[in-house]
């Protein structure tokens, strides 16, 4: 079953309080890797749009904007029940990107081909094509396996 982006964000928040921007980037990276590895681990309302600060999910932005502080605590005390595949993607994303700074994650996301295509052709606030995300992250996976 597809999860809400807030469920994914809440999972990352179990590790530590995270800035709004870093949380958006982690969720974008989760979405891309989930699409590449197994479409069943994707997101409800999983559309990310271009912004000056990289890809953002509008429903997550609305939720995050309800917090005055930039660093967000856990949303809920209890985590959603994740499947083994979802945990695999969540843990892989956290172990790969969790220690990186907000600035580094934003740079990684902005430099991703799906973001670049949407931003260069359509500008700000344009949806990033999920199929292009899937293909891009599948190619990244192949590059990692070969290298």
Language-model segments: residues:
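Domain-edge interaction signal
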Residues: 1-147
């Amino acid at each position: 079953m597809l999860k809400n982006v807030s469920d994914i964000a809440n999972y990352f928040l179990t590790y530590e309080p995270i800035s709004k921007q870093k949380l958006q980037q982690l969720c974008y990276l989760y979405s891309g890797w989930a699409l590449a590895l197994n479409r069943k681990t994707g997101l409800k309302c999983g559309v990310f749009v271009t912004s000056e600060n990289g890809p953002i999910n509008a429903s997550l932005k609305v939720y995050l904007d309800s917090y005055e502080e930039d660093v967000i605590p856990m949303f809920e005390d209890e985590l959603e029940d994740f499947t083994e595949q979802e945990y695999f993607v969540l843990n892989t994303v956290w172990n790969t990107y969790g220690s990186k700074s907000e600035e580094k994650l934003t740079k990684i996301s902005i430099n991703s081909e799906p973001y670049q295509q949407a931003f260069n052709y359509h500008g700000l606030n344009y949806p990033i094509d999920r199929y292009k995300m899937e293909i891009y992250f599948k190619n990244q996976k192949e590059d990692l396996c070969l290298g």
